[in-house]
Amino acid sequence: MKVLLQLISFLFLGIFGFSQENTKPIPACEFLTKYQNVRDFTISTTQDEIYFSIQNPAEDRAVIAVIKKQKNKWQEPQMTSFSGNYRNIEPFLTQDGLRLYFASNRPIDETTTKAKDYDIWYVERKDLKSKWSKPINVGAPVNSTNNEFYPCITTNGNLYFTADAIKTLGKDDILVCKWDGKQYTEPENLGMNINSTGYEFNAFVSPNEEFIIYTCYGRPDGLGSGDLYISYKNNKGNWDEPKNLGEKINSKQMDYCPFYDTTTQTLYFTSKRMIVIEKTFTNLKEFETEISSYENGFSRIYKYQIKL
């Protein structure tokens, strides 16, 4: 009996000890480790199609890439048909997989090649095996003569995005244009519970609008740069005060571009986290290993298992 009790005690402590361990975010996917500077992540509900952004080190050029799973095996990443020129970032795949929204500084008029401010665009397809259409500008009232970024579409068609001028409380804010069944309504600021006179940007809103995850920059309870925060919608339909997701997820560097996979309860996000170890290097190989590590200050995509 004593041995049995000791065994039960060991298992109990082991189970609960494991759940209390300081688990941390890990690289999102093996194939992403070969890219020096990546950001943004969206995955299909069927778990067989991933879109992400690849940038150059200066972050002034970017393409949206796709990787597909065939016969239970991930294929090589490919550049999407609508990328290759201008700066295309922040893909978001709708629940049915038939539309992909993104932000781009491409010109609206095909007669010019001059880049413009950032707008929300989308491509569409008839079914999951069809090719994407040419990019379509969402238009007003979503887009304006200023910048619009990071689209997120909920099940009812509401479009959440980041704006840096129109209807903001100061700097970047999260706005929503609601879908009334025929068209989008005028942009609405999510209010002081979500936004401030500072920077709030890049929001993921759950399909049923139960919670929102987004980046707040330089807040008093932050860890040093931009942190991921979460807010839940209360029974009155209002957003509660956001809470910092904490040190298990956030870092001292920029943490942004969240995407939550409700199927697997996995949070994907981009981070410029960097682990600096004060050490003396004895040869060049050691230094090369240090600066080429995953957590080296460049944008990288991470994942973290969490039930929200």
List PLM regions with ranges:
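Bacterial Sec-dependent N-terminal signal peptides
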Residues: 1-23
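Short, conserved micro-motifs composed of acidic
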Residues: 20-308
